[in-house]
């Protein structure tokens, strides 16, 4: 019998290694023009990593402690900066090339385990994974999901090993991976929940041993998260930053959840009822599969059941989180952990269903799967072509675009930073851009729903300050430029198509333009 871990060896997984190299090259070509993609969250990670690498602690670009995100990903980046002595803006694409290669290679090994008798299924699914826009749009950016998805696959492997051996060592490895994932993304708690659920429902584990394993796993699994939350609470009085109440209902989030799956597998153009039905069907299917594996305990810890259990736990977590807490709407990025946990078990389901049919029914079903594969790949190609054209012509969308690097307003600020008096505050609707391209610290303009923010800003009118305004960053949730110009006095220092730079002198507090 082939040793369990040998299916991850280069000899058995060479095709995944080739696919991984192709994936790494894709990241290189997508980032060749403007470097690693940068979103607002990326600037928080980047600035915090720089702060840690320079020995200043977990402080983000606004000069405040980072609490909206856990410390794991910035710590990971800071270690790379410290070892390489190269800033992550210059090396980020190389880091992501390595992470994407590793992700694809692990997928190949897992497929080897899931589909041991039907090797032909591996290549088509590797192609889907390598060229998936859902993954490429993550791994071309500086985002915590790039590390989190890899840790999720490592968790699958470790939990499978635990299921084979049931030793303390394998349990501790699972707990460490799950625990560390919690400080890469707070959603890492879903790994703790998935493993805890599987251990709890493990029929072969005697009660005394089960209780001991659950206590040990739970203690290690949540230790990192608890430490991170305690640190946040001691520093700011909040566990995970300032969280607002959700504006979307449970059913609205179910609809968004289904639409994201439509984006994953390109059925989003179907009528709404079908989109929701198909999206929810994945969830129901993996609940059913877990019940089946519960009664077939000899296969309880196979990769199919591990992926399916995680899929169910993460789905419940993310939909409920979006219902009770306000953050960006459910999208490919937030649901990216579901993509592989949904796709990998299908490498068993597809050939299994085909094997149950004979004659024209078998060939008919094979034809359907081939057509689906071709259609999905065609749409993936179309999406990737548009994405690649944008990346090669002007840089990846966001702060890696040429328009930001060539911004007259930012170049004006960089040309003579001395004009910005030390101690004089800077306000901006795009404070991430001010930090990234000038190195200066800027505060975000007040939120319209936060009376405290606006009162503090009004008190600032007694002092000199600068206002950097970018039209592309204007957000209805924050105070508008029209309101600022109407209620305060400003001297215009620079004007360009993308924005304006103003100075507010304290001596003109009671005047208006």
Specify the residue positions occupied by each region the protein language model found:
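Signature aromatic-anchored transmembrane alpha helix within multi-pass, membrane-resident enzymes
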Residues: 119, 123-124, 176, 193, ...
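Loop-to-helix entry region of an early transmembrane alpha helix in multi-pass inner-membrane enzymes
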Residues: 71, 75, 83-102, 123, ...
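Transmembrane-helix motifs of polytopic, lipid-linked glycan transferases
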Residues: 94-117, 150-158, 285-289
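Perimembrane helix-loop-helix junctions
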Residues: 2-5, 10, 158-164, 191-222, ...
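Short acidic/glycine- and proline-prone juxtamembrane loop motifs at membrane-interface regions
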Residues: 39, 134-147
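Membrane-lumen/periplasm interface segments of specific transmembrane helices
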Residues: 211-286, 311-318, 375-382
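Membrane-interface transmembrane helices that cradle and orient dolichyl/undecaprenyl
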Residues: 112-117, 155-171, 181, 205
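Membrane-embedded, lumen/periplasm-facing catalytic core of multi-pass transferases
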Residues: 371-433
């Amino acid at each position: 019998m082939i040793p369990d871990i040998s299916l991850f060896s280069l000899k058995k997984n060479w095709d995944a290694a080739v696919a991984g190299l192709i994936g790494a090259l894709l990241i290189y070509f997508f980032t060749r023009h403007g470097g690693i993609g940068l979103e607002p969250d990326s600037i928080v990670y980047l600035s915090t990593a720089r702060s840690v690498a320079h020995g200043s602690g977990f402080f983000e670009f606004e000069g405040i402690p980072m609490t909206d995100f856990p410390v794991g990903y910035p710590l990971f980046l800071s270690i790379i900066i410290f070892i390489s002595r190269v800033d992550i803006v210059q090396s980020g694409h190389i880091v992501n090339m390595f992470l994407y290669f590793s992700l694809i290679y692990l997928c190949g090994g897992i497929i080897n385990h899931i589909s041991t008798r039907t090797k032909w299924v591996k290549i088509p699914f590797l192609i889907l994974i390598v060229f998936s826009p859902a993954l490429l749009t993550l791994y071309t950016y500086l985002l915590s999901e790039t590390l989190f998805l890899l840790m999720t696959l490592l968790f699958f492997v470790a939990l499978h090993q635990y299921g084979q051996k049931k030793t303390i060592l394998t349990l501790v490895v699972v707990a460490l991976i799950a625990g560390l994932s919690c400080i890469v993304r707070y959603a890492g708690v879903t790994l703790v929940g998935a493993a805890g659920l599987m251990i709890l429902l493990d029929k072969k584990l005697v009660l005394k041993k089960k209780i001991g394993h659950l206590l040990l796993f739970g203690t290690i699994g949540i230790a990192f998260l608890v430490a991170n939350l305690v640190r946040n609470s001691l520093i700011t009085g909040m566990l995970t930053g300032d969280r607002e109440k959700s504006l979307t209902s449970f059913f609205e989030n179910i609809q968004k959840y289904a639409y994201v799956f439509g984006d994953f597998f390109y059925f989003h153009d179907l009528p709404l009822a079908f989109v929701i039905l198909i999206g929810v069907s994945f969830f129901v299917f993996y609940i059913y599969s877990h019940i089946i594996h519960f009664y077939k305990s000899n296969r309880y810890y196979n990769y199919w059941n591990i992926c399916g259990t995680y899929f169910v736990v993460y789905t419940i977590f993310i939909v409920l989180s979006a219902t009770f807490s306000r953050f960006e709407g459910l999208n490919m990025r937030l649901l990216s952990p579901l993509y592989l946990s949904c796709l990998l078990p299908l490498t068993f389901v597809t050939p299994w269903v085909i094997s149950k049919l004979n004659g024209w029914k078998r060939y008919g079903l094979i034809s359907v799967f081939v057509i689906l594969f071709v259609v999905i790949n065609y749409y993936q190609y179309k999406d990737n072509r548009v994405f690649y054209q944008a990346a090669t012509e002007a840089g990846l969308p966001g702060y890696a675009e040429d328009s930001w690097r060539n911004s007259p307003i930012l170049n004006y600020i960089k040309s003579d930073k001395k004009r910005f008096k030390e101690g004089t505050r800077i306000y901006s609707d795009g404070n991430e851009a001010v930090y990234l391209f000038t190195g200066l610290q800027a505060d975000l303009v007040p939120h319209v729903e936060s009376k405290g923010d606006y009162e503090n800003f009004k008190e600032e009118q007694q002092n000199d300050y600068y206002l950097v305004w970018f039209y592309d960053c204007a957000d209805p949730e924050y105070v508008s430029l029209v309101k600022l110009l109407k209620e305060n006095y400003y001297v215009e220092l620079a004007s360009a198509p993308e924005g304006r730079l103003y100075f507010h002198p304290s001596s003109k507090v009671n005047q208006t333009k």
